Amino acid sequence: MQKLPEAKLETPFQTAALTVLALCTYSADRNIGTEMLNWLRGPRPLNGQDISFLNDRFRDGKTYLPFTYFAGSTPDNNYTPTKPYSITIESNHVSGEEQGYMKLFIPCGGANSPRLIKLRQRGSDGKWFLGEQYLLTGVRTPKSEDPWA
């Protein structure tokens, strides 16, 4: 991930997109995903509570959760994104209210409203790091897992 152009972390949008990528990786390999998330968090790595939260969200086969943020992902196609893969990241009137922080929003194919991710800028070099993410909250059940579909 660190070889991608977005890994310069020059904008909060780059860091937000890489966070979705890291969460996708975490769903497949927790060790590599943890390394990626720790790198994105900069001087504030994941603690035990953070890791417990992540493990809880991916419990019961919910590995599809981070894929709901890719274009084309819907419950009807079991959150299979269209190619080429793309993610939309939005800002709004509250995004830059707090100095050194940026609140961004990522539309989700399994929810009615975009989900929040909060980034923090490091003063010494201007790079943007992951502060908080609210991307792993409940979404509509994929069609293949919905007994009512």
PLM ranges: what are they?
Residues A17-A22, S86-T88, K103-F105, P114-K118, ...:
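Ordered hydrophobic segments in well-structured contexts
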Residues P107-W148:
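Short beta-strand edge/turn micro-motifs at domain boundaries
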Residues S52-N112:
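Surface-exposed, charged secondary-structure patches
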Residues M1-A71:
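Core segments of small alpha/beta cavity-forming domains
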